[in-house]
């Protein structure tokens, strides 16, 4: 199995220009930090969704929805896994990361891409088993996945939450990052010719600093967010062999960023700045980036609105979607609300990270319309004996959320969410004000479930792919007619 490392690169005039541009942009951003509180909020729905109705072939959970009780580990029931209207197609490896992407190339090969380093450098402890880097997996025969390559250029070595793919252009990209931030080495690969063997087009410092990412619909503007460094860098990808920074600006403690379908709005999951009580206090920021999108000289985004919700935890990512003619975000909070406590200890009263749906049809006036809350997230359950379940009290895991995915942006109908200790959860979102849970899949390790990766849909096969930190890559088929017609 080949690995793809970075060829020897000298500091050419182009590279020196990129470094200089990045330093200037970073200086401008740090000089314009915005220390403000979110401007508006609305009350959050507090009730849990009804349990999914599990059909034939399911292995349902044994109690509270979303929970794997300690008793199930002791009895061996947890080792059998839990499923509801899903069927395991295949699995691979024993380590997963934070994002999964899917691509079908011009020859009809189907590939999966996912990072295996977990939170770099933790992956080094698995060296020789999973190691580090980004896995390339041939999924043309989904029952028999084959890992064909490992990408080891700087960004792909540790992409953290930034791995992203543009299907029409056939480009796979990432910026180097970790749980805080790292120098923003930015890697671009061409996967269009043979997705099993990506071709490196460029590896440059264009990202300035890295952690998460976003991409315009036309695939010509990449956004690198840096989280704790308070910067977002827009990169021109018109020539993927020579990416060029356009602007760097202060976007709050920016986590995941996504764009509107025309590329003129930027939705930012903002962790917020520390307050007297909490380590994070953020929500959602919406920017007008039309000037950036149009490549106007000295383009800068314009902040349109900031928004939060009553039970904010750690804002992770806003996924845009359009349902019945209105614009929404499938917004995810990760982990749990972190009190300003040096131990970041478990507190049942703190909000659990979940997904929610926010109406952004008026980008200056966003409002939450529903929450994808499970029984396991309710405070009365968080305060009970479930906190003794393996992994449940982890400040960077437990019964909380991390990422969601949709099969398409216009009328997606369903969503798949990585709910960490609760595994993969499937929701019907055709009515954004009344979402329903319709399925799940969870095969936890002895230390607890750790489904962290943004899932991806294989619409041709009615499958969802995701990874678990401790149990590897999974391909799961939706069963019992929960796959919507016409999708």
Which residues fall in each region the model found?
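Short linear, low-complexity motifs centered on an aromatic residue
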Residues: 1-5, 102-104
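Secretory targeting and sorting signals
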Residues: 3-39
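Feature marking well-ordered beta-strand scaffolds used for ligand recognition
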Residues: 22, 28, 41-487
């Amino acid at each position: 199995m080949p690995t793809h490392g970075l060829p020897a690169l000298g500091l050419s005039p182009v590279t020196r220009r990129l470094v200089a541009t990045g330093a200037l942009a970073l200086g401008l951003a740090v000089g314009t930090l915005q220390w403000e509180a979110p401007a508006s909020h609305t009350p959050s729905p507090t009730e849990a969704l009804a349990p999914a109705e599990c059909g034939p072939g399911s292995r349902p959970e044994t109690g509270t929805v979303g929970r794997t009780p300690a008793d199930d580990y002791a009895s061996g029931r947890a080792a059998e896994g839990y499923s509801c209207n899903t069927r395991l197609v295949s699995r691979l490896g024993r380590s997963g990361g934070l994002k999964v992407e899917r691509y079908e190339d011009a020859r009809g090969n189907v590939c999966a891409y996912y990072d295996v380093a977990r939170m770099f450098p933790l992956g080094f402890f698995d060296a020789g088993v999973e190691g580090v880097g980004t896995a390339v997996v041939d999924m043309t025969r989904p029952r028999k996945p084959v890992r064909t390559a490992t990408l080891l250029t700087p960004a792909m070595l540790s992409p953290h939450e930034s791995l992203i793919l543009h299907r029409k252009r056939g480009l796979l990209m990432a910026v180097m990052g970790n749980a805080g931030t790292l120098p923003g080495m930015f890697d671009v690969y061409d996967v269009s010719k043979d997705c099993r063997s990506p071709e490196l087009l460029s590896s440059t410092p264009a990202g300035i600093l890295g952690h998460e990412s976003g991409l315009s619909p036309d695939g010509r503007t990449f956004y690198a967010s840096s989280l704790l460094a308070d910067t977002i860098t827009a990169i021109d990808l018109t020539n993927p062999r020579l990416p060029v920074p356009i602007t760097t600006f202060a976007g709050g403690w920016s986590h995941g960023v996504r764009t509107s379908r025309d590329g003129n709005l930027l939705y930012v999951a903002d962790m917020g700045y520390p307050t007297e009580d909490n380590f994070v206090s953020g929500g959602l920021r919406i920017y007008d980036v039309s000037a950036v999108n149009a490549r106007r000289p000295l383009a800068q985004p314009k902040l349109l609105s900031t928004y939060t919700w009553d039970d904010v935890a750690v804002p992770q990512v806003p996924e845009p979607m359009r349902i019945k003619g209105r614009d929404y975000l499938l917004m995810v909070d990760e982990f749990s609300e972190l009190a300003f406590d040096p131990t970041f200890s478990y507190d049942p009263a703190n909000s659990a990270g979940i997904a929610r749906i926010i109406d952004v049809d008026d980008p200056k006036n966003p409002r939450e319309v529903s929450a994808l809350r499970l029984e396991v997230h309710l405070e009365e359950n968080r305060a009970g004996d479930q906190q003794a379940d393996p992994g449940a009290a982890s400040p960077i895991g437990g019964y909380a959320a991390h990422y969601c995915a949709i099969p398409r942006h216009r009328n997606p109908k369903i969503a798949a969410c990585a709910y960490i200790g609760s595994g993969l959860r499937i929701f019907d979102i055709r009515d954004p004000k009344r979402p329903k849970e319709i399925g799940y899949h969870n095969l936890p390790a002895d230390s607890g479930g750790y489904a962290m990766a943004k899932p991806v849909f294989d619409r041709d096969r009615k499958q969802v792919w995701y990874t678990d930190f401790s149990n590897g890559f999974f391909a799961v088929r939706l069963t019992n007619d929960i796959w919507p017609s016409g999708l």
